[in-house]
Amino acid sequence: MIQYQDLLERILSDGAEKHDRTGTGTLSVFGHQMRFDLAAGFPMLTTKRLPLKAIVHELLWFLQGDTNIKYLHDHGVTIWDEWADANGDLGPVYGAQWRSWPTADGGSIDQIANVVEMIKRNPDSRRLMVTAWNPADVEKMALPPCHCLFQFYVANGKLSCQLYQRSADVFLGVPFNIASYALLTLMVAQVTGLKPGEFVHTLGDAHLYSNHLEQARLQLTRAPRALPVMTINPAVKDIFGFRYEDFTLTGYDPHPHIKAEVAV
């Protein structure tokens, strides 16, 4: 994906050295946008191998409203382990905000159910949004949301999605985020009777950690390959009805995995 390669090149050439919460240090740029036409293939990075199982199960976990890592562990996914407490809890992170945003009167809002229904009833609405950034809950979260706001847009029978990501770990996190939100767009399009349009990824602080620079340079020596195709079980019509077995990725022929340590 040349869009991702361009981002790596921009950070390596123009990035500012910054200190960060983890103490690792970063090269950072502010404000970057990538666009992916979902009709042109599924935007799964090919310049290194990504684990589809982890991407799919994490998204299904978010959609369940779950905030404990047991489901992930049950399916062999460990990407959230560094932030969980001794009981596996993460506090009111993504799933809680997506599915049960707390209201002042003690109730809750299911943002996912609401946005799917709104797309069906009023596809021209400019309010087709979901946010995970809840200032009242941020201090209770093991990790405040990095990908914090997304908006759907319907035109000419196609559903597009734009994600705003306040903090973007470009080497490790961003490839996951691209695939995850592209998949979410395909899923929402299917259950609302629309075709997939674009995934637009807007980044705030887009950074490479100082211990990922050599890996990024290695990745830039690799030519992107043809994108794979994601097929979804057409029988699923409920956004909460998807299972891992409903997704099939074909034609994924990436370069080998590149190891890098996560900054916690």
Curated annotation (Swiss-Prot):
GO BP: dTMP biosynthetic process; dTTP biosynthetic process; methylation
UniProt keyword Secreted present: no
Assigned keywords, A-Z: Cytoplasm, Methyltransferase, Nucleotide biosynthesis, Transferase
EC number assigned by the record: 2.1.1.45
Keyword Oxidoreductase: no
Pathway: Pyrimidine metabolism; dTTP biosynthesis
EC category: transferase
A cellular component annotation (GO) from this entry: cytosol
Catalysis: reaction(s): dUMP + (6R)-5,10-methylene-5,6,7,8-tetrahydrofolate = 7,8-dihydrofolate + dTMP
Record-listed (6R)-5,10-methylene-5,6,7,8-tetrahydrofolate binding positions: D169, A263
Example of a GO MF term: thymidylate synthase activity
Classification via PANTHER family: THYMIDYLATE SYNTHASE (PTHR11548:SF9), THYMIDYLATE SYNTHASE 1 (PTHR11548)
HAMAP family registered for this protein in UniProt: Thymidy_synth_bact
The protein's assembly and partners: Homodimer.
Descriptive protein name: Thymidylate synthase
